[in-house]
Amino acid sequence: MYYWFAMPRRVLAYTKTLTADIDITKIGFYGNSWGGQIAYNMNIDPDIKCCVAQYGNGWIHYWKTNSVWLYNIPYSEPPFSDGNNLYISTLECQAYAKYARNPMLWMMSTNDFHGQFDRGFRNFEITPVQGSYAFKANASHDITGFEQDVRLWFDKYLKGSAITWPSNPNTIPSIVAIGTAKATVSPSQPSDVTAVQFYYALVTADSLARTWFTATTTNNGDGTWSAQFPYSDGTRYVFAYAQITYSNTIIVCSKQAAFIPNNL
């Protein structure tokens, strides 16, 4: 992993010498898969003006190496060796999220075999810069239909296009009745929203194996949208989020809600 971090830095150093060919004040970084992991490291460099991390988002030692799924019941972690902890704190990309300098876009599939869907949100909780994310349901290493976000992100932050980027709202869960849950979102710029689609999933801690179902969405007319959906076990996790499409074709998703109905 060290070499993967080192190589793009060498490329960046060379790129900054090409002053006759490019505007070196407008350099962005796009990383796909393992390149997504690298994007977090590159985003601590002041010469990078914005980043896109596609799929990769760290936490490899947790979910991929040790099958430590965030929503296991009960949750437990194995003892990490000193070597594990050194790797986690220096080469796992979540270690760099809190030092980010530039806007970061995370493009993801909910069931991705490389990126970790559930833990990826943590990177955006600790980052000091603007971030955004969107993900395709029931897919792995596929963002078909979402690609325009990448172009528009670079248009906004490199070209300076007058694009207002919507925020990622929280997904607020509630219980309608025993066996029926509801999720509600409050999108930014609600007058520009053209579509909202809710997804929900039940029980499965392994995000790669999770099945996402669509739920009928209701526009509440007050700037919020909601959906109701069934669950069968109030002691197990329920997951929900909304995919929000805007008139300028930007798609963002709400932050995933993961909740145990009996605890609400």
Model region roles, listed by residue range:
Residues 21-33:
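Alpha/beta-hydrolase fold nucleophile elbow
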